[in-house]
Amino acid sequence: MTPILFVDRDGTLITEPADFQIDAYEKLRFVDGVIPAMLKLRDAGYQFVIVSNQDGLGSESYPQASFDGPNNLMLQIFASQGIVFREVLIDCSWPADNAPTRKPGVGLMVPYLQDRTIDWSRSAMVGDRITDIQFAQNLNIRGFQLRTEQFGGDWDWAGIAHELADAPRRAVVQRNTKETRIRVELDLDRVAEPHTATGLPFFDHMLEQIGKHGGFALDIRAEGDLHIDEHHTIEDTGLALGQALREALGDKRGIGRYGFDPDDSPWRVAGDTTQHGFTLPMDETIASAALDFSGRPYFVFDGDFKRERVGDMPTELVPHFFRSVCDASGLNLHLHVRGENDHHKVEGCFKALARALRQAIRREGTALPSTKGAL
């Protein structure tokens, strides 16, 4: 499936003059940032189609030859930089004609609407006018109005390329049951201070470690039946967080997939064969996490706690929380901890997971990290 970026011409690829007609070579100027942005989108798998209204093109007031020269030069310059358009679609009608082929009408789109090889979920439209956004709405695709002096707009080409090619990995999960109401919001491509409020201060402190040391924006709000005990709140928070990770990662293209420590980690302790994965020290405690976003949930925990609870968090729910995250995210996680202080051991587990996540979710290209073709 191939995503298509439909683009307006005047004011979007090339700047629009005061008379709204680019009918001379000296009027040809490219919009800032358009070429590097389109190269990035090309490398992300996009094909390009120009869709442009050219009022009265071919008439005495706007001869075809006056249009063709600058337009052909524009296409040649794009091609010289590695940007080739799949098609150039021009509507020559006047606004008063109300032609179905004139944007925001989609009359020119019939062959594309019949093409089952197009990935419409990723396709988009870029233009400088509100009619371009209406055109996108009529196609049921995303529309970006480029920022211009004439018509406003909120986007520049760099931002559009980031939004589409980098596909910011965000998720908002609302999990409501008779026992809990959990909301998790995360953005794997934005660094921000974590915010958590579950009614369990120590648990909040642990959840903050995941966002802080995982290097991504994390907001968790939970209301649970704490008058009974902590089990439902902690378990359902893990399930909601796991679901959010799964949704934000999408098809997992480009990610590292694995989170682990290389064999020459400076944190390894000689003679301790139980340690593997991302190994993290915390005073006398050492914790390690190795993980794989394989899509096959599996959890192994090696550790114990002397105390029944740390703060307001029962220690028996520490591995249960991580198991819940694995079940909902499709994560394979091996978590090991050794130490004397249970506070340090619990916190070490959360921090080790966070650092392993940081490595696994990092994007390193666009390839799918699996020979199976799916994760």
UniProtKB/Swiss-Prot annotation:
Cofactor section: Mg(2+)
Region of interest (Imidazoleglycerol-phosphate dehydratase), ranges: 169-375
Pathway where this protein functions: Amino-acid biosynthesis; L-histidine biosynthesis; L-histidine from 5-phospho-alpha-D-ribose 1-diphosphate: step 6/9; Amino-acid biosynthesis; L-histidine biosynthesis; L-histidine from 5-phospho-alpha-D-ribose 1-diphosphate: step 8/9
Localization per Swiss-Prot or TrEMBL: Cytoplasm
Keywords: Amino-acid biosynthesis, Cytoplasm, Histidine biosynthesis, Hydrolase, Lyase, Magnesium, Metal-binding, Multifunctional enzyme
Record: active site: 8 (nucleophile), 10 (proton donor)
Domain of life, per lineage: Bacteria
Reaction(s) catalysed (UniProt annotation): D-erythro-1-(imidazol-4-yl)glycerol 3-phosphate = 3-(imidazol-4-yl)-2-oxopropyl phosphate + H2O; L-histidinol phosphate + H2O = L-histidinol + phosphate
GO CC terms: cytoplasm
Ranges where the record places region Histidinol-phosphatase: 1-168
Primary subcellular site in the record, as a coarse category: cytoplasm
Enzyme Commission number(s) from the entry: 3.1.3.15, 4.2.1.19
Homology family: In the N-terminal section; belongs to the histidinol-phosphatase family.
Protein name (Swiss-Prot/TrEMBL): Histidine biosynthesis bifunctional protein HisB
Organism: Xanthomonas campestris pv. campestris (strain ATCC 33913 / DSM 3586 / NCPPB 528 / LMG 568 / P 25)
